[in-house]
Design a protein with these regions (language model features):
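Histidine- and acidic-residue-rich, metal-dependent catalytic cores
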Residues: 3-232
Length: 232
């Protein structure tokens, strides 16, 4: 399935073969975190809301949750922070339920008016979670900040660098990676190597260099079918 594909890409197993034991342990830990997060009825409620509105956004949110958890593990974040990160990743696009479905499914690039409306979804999601649920503020803020750029040129509040939560910076990278490697109405899926080239090329601008470094050491940056020898 798509989530398994992401895992093998991350650990450079382009052939889909068994993962190394060290990486299996990371994946097992992430699975435990995911299970714990999904046991929260408020998380499940919001995921069901997303799925009932748009299937792609739902599956994208699940993929990003798994991917963000793996990156968080690789960044050696503590368990509580990873739980907050995965929770925010599952919920990061909840604000899209307030965006017209015609905009969500537009088979083309959005016009200026549509793009401005779409850019409201982080704030809309943050406000929904703040008003109606009791998630930690770090979760809500990570949802709010997931389209901010490291250099401060993102949205909605033009924050950058250490003014952003580290979890927001991880989520930003995981979100872009899954979106670009997924088939969309307006573009085919890019190869993992192409996406990593894009992310590495925007290190220090769109993405936190420390997170890019972790991803570049871990993710598949070689064409599908190319065998890579893992270093000890």
């Amino acid at each position: 399935n798509n989530a398994l594909r992401l895992v093998h890409q991350f650990f450079r197993k382009s052939d889909g073969g068994p993962l190394p034991e060290s990486e299996k342990r990371i994946l097992e830990n992430v699975q435990q975190v995911v299970n714990d997060v999904l046991s929260n009825k408020d998380v499940m409620y919001n995921l069901v809301e997303v799925k009932s509105y748009d299937d792609y956004t739902y599956f994208h949110s699940v993929n990003v949750g798994i991917l963000a958890g793996i990156i968080g593990m690789k960044c050696k974040l503590d368990r509580a922070t990873i739980e907050d990160l995965v929770t925010a990743a599952f919920l990061h696009d909840i604000g899209k339920i307030f965006i017209d479905i015609e905009i969500i499914h537009a088979p083309r690039r959005l016009n200026d008016q549509e793009r401005i409306r779409m850019m409201e979804h982080p704030r809309l999601g943050y406000e929904l979670l703040e008003k109606n649920f009791r998630f930690p503020e770090s979760v809500n803020r990570t949802v709010l900040e997931h389209h901010e750029w490291y250099n401060g040129l993102g949205y909605p509040n033009h924050r950058g660098g250490n003014d952003l939560l580290f979890t927001s910076r991880v989520l930003k990278a995981a979100d872009v990676y899954d979106a670009m490697t997924s088939k969309r109405p307006y573009h085919p899926p890019y190869l993992p190597s192409e996406v990593m080239e894009y992310i590495m090329g925007r290190s220090g601008m769109e993405f936190d260099p420390a997170i890019v470094e972790v991803m570049s050491r871990s993710m598949c940056v070689y064409p599908v079918g190319c065998e890579v020898e893992l270093s000890n």
